Amino acid sequence: MSRMRKQTAFILLVFSFSVLIPAFSAAQDRLKTYPGYEQYQKMSKEIQGAVKLGTLQQVTWKDAGKTFEFTKDSKIWRYDIKSKKTTEVGAAQPPAKPEGFGRPAGMPERGRQFTEAVSPDKKLKAFCRDRNLWLSDADGKNEFAVTTEGNEKARTKYGSASWVYGEELNQNSAMWWSPDSKKIAYYRFDESKAPDYFLQLDQTKLYSKADIEAYPKAGQPNPIAEMYIYDIAAKKITQVDVRDGKPFEDAVVGHYAYRVSWSPDGKELLFNRTNRRQNIMEFTAANPETGKCRVIIREEWPPSWAENSPPMQYLKDNKRFIWTSERTGFRNIYLYDLSGKLLATLTKHPFEVANIIKVDEDAGLLYYMARDGANHMMMQLHRVNLDGKKDVRLTDPAYNHSVAAANISPDNKYFVDTAQTHDAPPFTRLIDAKGKTVAELAKSDMTKFEQLGLKKVELIKFKSADGSRDLFGVLHFPSNFDPNKKYPLLVSVYAGPGWAGASERFATSNPFTEYGFLVASFDTRGSAGLGKKAMDAIYMHLGVVEMDDQAAGVKSLWDRAYVNKDRVGIYGTSYGGYASALCLLRHPEAFAAASAASAVTSWYQYDTIYTERYMWIPQENKDGYEAGNAMKYIDNLKGRLMIYYGTADNNVHPTNAMQLIQALQKAGKSFEVQVGPDAGHSGLRPDRMMEFFIENLVLNK
């Protein structure tokens, strides 16, 4: 091309671009011109406060259980049981403002641990510096290194844990003082065989940098966890034999060692350990003088995975403890002592126990919530003796109940109960020890809800994709719903193991309905509350069972005249992003559009602990990994796909999105991408997401 022709081409290019600028700028406000925008703007702010809930806060018993105080409507009130009168005490302190989104204030960053730990007697401080454990006086003086071998070249570290332990085992500490402050236990990690992942950070700055993290992906070598105990006075280090002298191998219990603490008397170091497959879990005690271990409780679930961190609660003697287990196929409660002796089976239910509410040793009673209402979502308060006898349900099974420990009177004669369902707003009552209602304390005010014309959420029952069981979902309607019209449907999804799409908690409709959509959420066979045996349906099949059940939920609505089955979208973040992409790709007959944010796209790409718990390793479950691989279904793409990822996501790496994008490009598919520069594990902006759905499910004829 001659110089003249180049100049002419350049002038034409500039002219063409300048012509496009005004149109492009105007297009930035296109959501404001879309159907439903004004209705959404008008209603979304109103919906949030449309119901004055009939709930009480901060219940506190007074006068040996004769009265109690509570907070409601920014005031403190006192209720007298004998007179059944409520009197105003004064103004309540406003609730503290949250310090921000994400992790609780003061907690380490995602996947990390606290970098220091002060001894119980406040005299000493342990801290991690340059991959080694150090000790000093509490004021920082007289510091010295307990370990010196930790270094970046050898990829070893002390007093810190590998990222995957923090993320998947909730291990936010790596140093543990004994109760008498005489010893400190700590982690040693060897990451020399665990592959590194290079994450590029600061991509919006002049120079970017690389964050290098040992990140073992499914089937890859894991970091090796060891534990040591340092005796302050003796200056002696003892290695804890976390694997009973066995080598670090997949089958060995002790492949993972976590949830570390000292026994209340300080005589033993306690921790949980599992094999790599995570179908065996042992609650273990180590002798701090010798490092030898003994098993207190062993839990096994050969068909799939064992719960890795069962809730436990010590009794007053600090020797006996309440333990929960899924060994029967449903979570139940047991009483053990630290010798490992089973003292009592406290519950034997063919349904799930949810959580322990209160233990009253003097009265010999335990209160807990269980899922034995009219359906598994309706929590009920139970009371049982600490010998396992006289188990009684205290609440009405027609409702879902909430009772906190503070709501039960000191003498156990009464409790404050809040009840609700998906379509009955919460109300609060005073109940006696026999389950009889003593007084109505509060009920929800639905005046504004009704004035706005809001619609109650509908509970849906449908068959799982394989027809094996009933599942539930919820359907949200716009305030101006007209059953004679057809509406596009959005599915809000997460769908990961233990997630619930349906709920018996009262909720106002999803504000996205005001754009002119129906919005639904559906359970899967892996949802919470169905029991361990039911959840096993997803084992080795992530990305198949849950997605097929989402499609089954959508198809259960096809016979409703007001549902436009050809205009169904699905959205979610993280596992929900994965579910969104897979549903669109696996079930093009059910879904027409998907917004997939921060999505795993292949289980080959995710970490060992989470992935292998449900999928085992790809070397021994190739069919399962391939069936859950989004790239396998690229040719199925018929609808519209929006992909979002954060460039600094250290949980679901950008590699996931990149591999999906590459596969789509190679297949010549049309799709959209939104990127969060320097953003971590995050979601797509709601306004951009709704813009995408309106364009593809409403305006695209």
Predicted region positions:
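Bacterial N-terminal signal peptides
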Residues: 11-22
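A short helix->beta-strand "capping" segment at the edge of beta-propeller domains
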Residues: 31-56, 102-106, 235-243
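Non-catalytic accessory segments flanking enzyme active sites
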Residues: 55-60, 65-66, 71-76, 86-107, ...
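Short coil/turn segments that connect the beta-strands within blades of beta-propeller domains
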Residues: 65-66, 121-123, 180-182, 265-267, ...
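Alpha/beta-hydrolase-fold serine-hydrolase catalytic core, especially in secreted/extracellular enzymes
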Residues: 73-74, 288-289, 328, 336, ...
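A flexible loop/linker signature enriched in serine peptidases of the S9 family
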Residues: 75, 123-134, 138, 148-172, ...
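Short loop/turn segments that connect beta-strands within beta-propeller blades
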Residues: 81-84, 138-141, 232-235, 288-291, ...
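Serine-hydrolase catalytic core recognition
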Residues: 196, 257, 266, 396, ...
